[in-house]
Design a protein with these regions (language model features):
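N-terminal targeting leaders
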Residues: 1-88, 92-93, 97, 127-129
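Dinucleotide-binding Rossmann-like beta1-alpha1 core, especially the glycine-rich loop
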Residues: 125-206, 346-347
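Glycine-rich FAD pyrophosphate-binding loop
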Residues: 101-122
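C-terminal catalytic lobe of FAD-dependent flavoproteins
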Residues: 2-4, 22-27, 31, 36, ...
């Protein structure tokens, strides 16, 4: 670690910031009045040879209280689970399911009133192929493994999952000539399967309304779509069916660490005494790691907005596609001047598993970990940019939009590991995009480490299959009629837009997750 070089780079941005080696990490301290400069300092501190960037620069005048449940009781006081999982997003629920394979008492706590209330419900549901990643990244390892797991996982959990593919479309002749062999070489090096070149005529066969400028593109057959929140809920329900426990409205506000172990976790529902802790806390994962004395990273929230179009516009995309970013955006498609734009795959136009067209997302570095606000400026910029990929896009097609915050680290990689300074914590942190893809594979590694460290035995009665009522609107009339004959409440439609029946709502309320 060349600390002098890092100090020069950081102080060029902000001379008042202190740079030091803190337990093998690059630690930044001080106070600035501009969030963009804080972000830039963190990026400048990234280097090989350090465990990570611990960016403790304060934003002058800014303080954010985490959203906490109002509930306070002693329901969990004195409990001694073998494993405590902090966070009920897709990673936490996938970990709970994997650990329910073992003869262990597993407890998951989530501060919201349901699972999948953070980034796990505020994303597009893409199962990514991994072509945008780099050799040596944890992201690449877990995305490749997780992508391959989804076919069987969806079958076991009764999830809708389609490999509708992704396309990366070229708008210029030079891209169409130069990029394909390089793209194919990268796919081979990374181990991404199902990548091939498609010409202009094949693009027209794949997409009913392709952009007129399309010269050719790269087709990635392994990409797919799921419902991210339905996947999270199914993972959680299956974990509960196999013996795991879930406590919602439960907020972790401190830990006691003795020697090199967490011995007590303080919550609004009492003190818990676990043998092991798994940190799956999303945008708060660095806060949890800090409580446990194991922090080597910093989460800098990266906000993104997605737009949902009316289902009648399904002809806009039958797969997921975007304009190649190698050629610069035309002036008319460039976003209006705004705050620092963060690292992003660039967004695109895609068909969701529920049949709507989704457009976006964008990316902005923000200080707030739970900033879910939307703005007309962001909506306008997304439409302006993505009209290049799909010229038929129109603001009048929008039915709603939403924002979420990604749990990005300055290294732009996951932090999936055993504890370094605290031996009974397991980190599953920095899980931003493509976290939905990676979650099942991350959970397998966490399970294997805990199985080894706690000397846990496998259950003989673990059931990987979760059976639930299928989405009736997706069934053929004769299949739907069979369900209605058994239970007339399946024929009583409550939501006419999405054709959701009273019976399906009751089934959801009576599912294992309460």
């Amino acid at each position: 670690m060349n600390l002098a070089k890092i100090r020069r780079a950081v102080n060029k941005i902000a001379p008042s910031v202190k740079v030091e080696n803190y337990r093998g990490c690059v630690r930044l301290t001080g106070e600035l009045d501009n969030w963009t400069d804080i972000y830039k300092c963190g990026k400048a501190a990234v280097c090989k040879g350090s465990l990570g960037v611990v960016n403790d620069i304060r934003l002058k005048g800014f303080h954010e209280e985490p959203k906490k449940p109002t509930l306070k009781d002693d329901a969990l006081s004195g409990q001694k689970p073998d494993v405590l999982i902090v966070g009920g997003g897709i990673v936490g629920c996938a970990v709970a399911r994997e650990l329910s394979r073992l003869k262990l008492d597993v407890l998951l706590v989530e501060k919201s009133n349901d699972v999948a209330c953070g980034a796990s419900s505020r994303n597009d549901g893409c199962i990514h192929p991994g072509i945008d990643l780099h050799k040596g990244q944890q992201k690449l390892k877990y995305v490749l493994e997780g992508n391959r797991m989804y076919t069987q996982l969806a079958k076991n959990l009764g999830l809708s999952f389609k490999r509708w593919a992704q396309m990366f479309i070229f708008s210029t002749g030079w891209e169409n000539t130069i990029i394909p062999p390089l793209f194919l070489l990268k796919a081979k090096i990374l181990g991404v399967e199902g990548v091939r070149y498609v010409g202009k005529e094949e693009i027209k066969r794949i997409e009913p309304n392709p952009p007129a400028w399309a010269k050719g593109g790269m087709y990635m057959a392994s990409a797919g779509m799921v419902s991210p929140y339905k996947t999270t809920i199914a993972l959680c329900d299956n974990a509960i069916q196999n013996g795991a426990r879930v406590s919602l409205n439960t907020y972790v506000d401190g830990m006691d660490v003795k020697g090199d172990k967490v011995v007590c976790v303080h919550t609004n529902r009492g003190d818990i005494y676990p043998r092991a802790v798994v940190n799956c806390a999303g945008v708060y994962s660095d806060v949890i790691a800090d409580m446990a004395g194991d922090r080597t990273f910093t989460i800098h929230p990266r906000k993104g907005t997605d737009i949902i179009l009316d289902k009648k516009k399904v002809g806009y995309a039958l797969s997921s596609y975007a304009r190649s970013y190698f050629a610069p955006l035309p002036k008319e498609a460039q976003p209006d001047k705004q705050e620092e734009v963060g690292h992003t795959k660039g967004g695109g136009v895609m068909r969701t598993i529920d049949g709507n067209i989704l457009v976006g997302p964008d990316a902005h570095e923000v200080p707030s970990r739970e900033d879910y606000s939307t703005s007309i400026k962001d909506i306008d910029n997304i439409i302006k940019k993505q009209k290049l990929a799909q010229p038929m896009l129109n603001k009048g097609d929008i039915i709603t939009y939403f924002s979420g915050t990604r749990a990005a680290t300055y290294e732009e990689d996951f932090v999936v590991r055993r504890g370094i300074f605290t031996k009974n914590i397991y980190e599953a942190a920095g899980i931003q995009s493509p976290g939905i893809t990676a979650a099942p594979a991350i959970a397998v590694d966490i399970r294997n480490w805990i199985k080894e460290d706690l000397k846990a035995e496998e259950k003989t009665n673990f059931n990987p299959v979760y059976k639930h009522t299928p989405r009736l609107a997706n069934l053929k009339d004769e299949e739907r009629a069979k369900y209605i004959a058994k239970n007339p409440e399946y024929g009583e439609i409550i939501c006419r837009c999405e054709e959701v029946s009273k019976g399906e709502i009751i089934d959801a309320l009576e599912s294992p997750l309460k």
